[in-house]
Amino acid sequence: MSNGRHLAKGSPMPDVPEDGILRLYSMRFCPFAQRVHLVLDAKQIPYHSIYINLTDKPEWLLEKNPQGKVPALEIVREPGPPVLTESLLICEYLDEQYPLRPLYPRDPLKKVQDKLLIERFRAVLGAFFKASDGGDLEPFWSGLDIYERELARRGTEFFGGEQTGILDYMIWPWCERLELLKLQRGEDYNYDQSRFPQLTLWLERMKRDPAVMAFYMEAEVQAEFLRTRSLGRPNYNLLVKDA
């Protein structure tokens, strides 16, 4: 197991115990991989984390996962064993396969409504990436307006009710990066708490969630990773003490 260090080309296959526990191929700074960590931690599902250098991937990764993508979940107890990709599909599988602490609503209509809101968030994260690259901030704020209204309509502390649910976790990685966006944009950053009163409270509640806390990363660390990536030398091991 990588123990937090990102494995690169030439790295041997990690010595993971043959214990039947799920193996998650991940990257510490990837918001899509973060979704899967959040679900695994929220549901308290045991798993091994294997972090991958996506710039210089280890050769054996393509044997496990021909797409070479993260997140990828290896289900070692199944024949094969199969490797699942795509964060939303992995998270849905986990919620169905491990029914304790359900994250998707049990009601079919509410489940579909949450899925639609997760799908709709694709446009919001697209606007986020453009804003973080110096683009107009307003499309991102306009996208968040939808979730501000929805949280107000539900009248609950979280989108999942009185505890976190799937919608909370699927949009969180980009909401966590609001502080990163603030660093990137400086004086241009114009998040308005009066425009987002419900989301502002939700952000603070989410920061106290155990699953969120387990994978939370300070904006300054995220910014430093992006700085090294912009120089063509991404430091994937910023969080490794002896990196």
From Swiss-Prot:
Residues 107-230 form the GST C-terminal domain. Its EC number is 1.5.4.1. Pfam families: GST_C_2 (PF13410), GST_N_3 (PF13417). Disulfide bonds: none annotated. Keywords: Oxidoreductase. It is an enzyme of class 1 (oxidoreductase). Glutathione binds at residues 57, 70, 86-87. Residues 20-102 form the GST N-terminal domain. It catalyses: 2-amino-6-acetyl-3,7,8,9-tetrahydro-3H-pyrimido[4,5-b][1,4]diazepin-4-one + glutathione disulfide + H2O = 6-pyruvoyl-5,6,7,8-tetrahydropterin + 2 glutathione. The keyword Oxidoreductase applies. SUPFAM superfamilies: GST C-terminal domain-like (SSF47616), Thioredoxin-like (SSF52833). Coiled coil: none annotated. GO terms for cellular component: cytoplasm. Disruption phenotype: Sepia eye color, due to defects in 2-amino-6-acetyl-3,7,8,9-tetrahydro-3H-pyrimido(4,5-b)[1,4]diazepin-4-one (pyrimidodiazepine or PDA) synthesis, a key intermediate in red eye pigment drosopterin biosynthesis. The active site is at 30 (nucleophile). InterPro entries: Glutathione-S-Trfase_C-like, Glutathione-S-Trfase_C_sf, Glutathione_S-Trfase, Glutathione_S-Trfase_N, GST_omega, GST_Omega/HSP26, Thioredoxin-like_sf. GO terms for molecular function: glutathione dehydrogenase (ascorbate) activity; glutathione transferase activity; protein homodimerization activity; pyrimidodiazepine synthase activity. GO terms for biological process: eye pigment biosynthetic process; glutathione metabolic process; pteridine biosynthetic process. CDD domains: GST_C_Omega, GST_N_Omega. Homodimer. Belongs to the GST superfamily. Omega family. Mediates the conversion of 2-amino-4-oxo-6-pyruvoyl-5,6,7,8-tetrahydropteridine (6-PTP; also named 6-pyruvoyltetrahydropterin) to 2-amino-6-acetyl-3,7,8,9-tetrahydro-3H-pyrimido(4,5-b)[1,4]diazepin-4-one (pyrimidodiazepine or PDA), a key intermediate in red eye pigment drosopterin biosynthesis. This is Pyrimidodiazepine synthase. It comes from Drosophila melanogaster (Fruit fly).
